């Protein structure tokens, strides 16, 4: 199994520890960078991990930045990626088993290396439990990736704003 991994400069050491762990378990690791502590931008490496997964160069991906929020948002912009930002085993297993997540994201300054490694190991071993409900949910998520001309309409949210002004939504 091939695992793509990427990070920003803040968590290069953590990424290398995770990479070494994966290699010790017999996985092939595709290191998408960054490779040092020179200041860089996490979207670059989230995109690289996502592209490696959707282009089938890797089976799964791991993204790490300081909090995990930025790189996870970036990788989720790659069509075909379903990434979950996790800090615990339950969330990681749910993401894989119910939503067929193909990337997992971490805050390397939030979650310790050993816990990340344990969670990643369980995530890799977990299997998607296909059900009609799960398939429908994943299809709805995938539909959000589609480009719709209506989204470019400057009045796209007008209806909702008017409802807000009329008090139809609760705070």
Swiss-Prot record:
EC number: 5.3.1.26
This protein's UniProt keywords: Isomerase, Lactose metabolism
Biological process annotations from GO: D-allose catabolic process; galactose catabolic process; lactose catabolic process via tagatose-6-phosphate; pentose-phosphate shunt, non-oxidative branch
Keyword Isomerase attached: yes
Full protein name: Galactose-6-phosphate isomerase subunit LacB 1
Quaternary structure and partners: Heteromultimeric protein consisting of LacA and LacB.
SUPFAM superfamilies named in the record: Ribose/Galactose isomerase RpiB/AlsB (SSF89623)
Pathway the protein contributes to: Carbohydrate metabolism; D-galactose 6-phosphate degradation; D-tagatose 6-phosphate from D-galactose 6-phosphate: step 1/1
Catalytic activity: aldehydo-D-galactose 6-phosphate = keto-D-tagatose 6-phosphate
MF terms (GO), sorted A to Z: galactose-6-phosphate isomerase activity; ribose-5-phosphate isomerase activity
Gene: lacB1
HAMAP family: LacB (MF_01556)
PANTHER family hit by this protein: DNA DAMAGE-REPAIR_TOLERATION PROTEIN DRT102, RIBOSE-5-PHOSPHATE ISOMERASE B
EC supergroup of this enzyme: isomerase
Protein family (similarity comment): Belongs to the LacAB/RpiB family.
Superkingdom: Bacteria
């Amino acid at each position: 199994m091939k695992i793509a991994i990427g990070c920003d400069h803040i968590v290069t050491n953590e990424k290398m520890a995770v990479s070494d762990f994966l290699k010790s378990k017999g996985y092939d690791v595709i290191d998408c960078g960054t490779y040092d502590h020179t200041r860089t931008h996490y979207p670059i490496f989230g995109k690289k991990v996502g592209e490696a997964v959707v282009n089938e160069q890797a089976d799964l991906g791991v993204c790490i930045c300081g909090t995990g929020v930025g790189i996870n948002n970036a990788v989720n912009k790659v069509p075909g990626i379903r990434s979950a930002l996790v800090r615990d085993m339950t969330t990681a297993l749910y993401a894989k088993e119910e939503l067929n997540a193909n990337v997992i994201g971490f805050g390397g300054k939030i979650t310790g290396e050993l816990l990340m490694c344990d969670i990643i190991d369980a995530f890799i071993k977990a299997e998607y439990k296909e059900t009609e409900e799960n398939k429908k949910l994943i299809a709805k998520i995938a539909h959000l990736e589609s480009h719709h001309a209506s989204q470019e309409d400057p009045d796209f949210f007008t209806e909702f704003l008017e409802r807000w002004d009329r008090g139809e939504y609760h705070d």
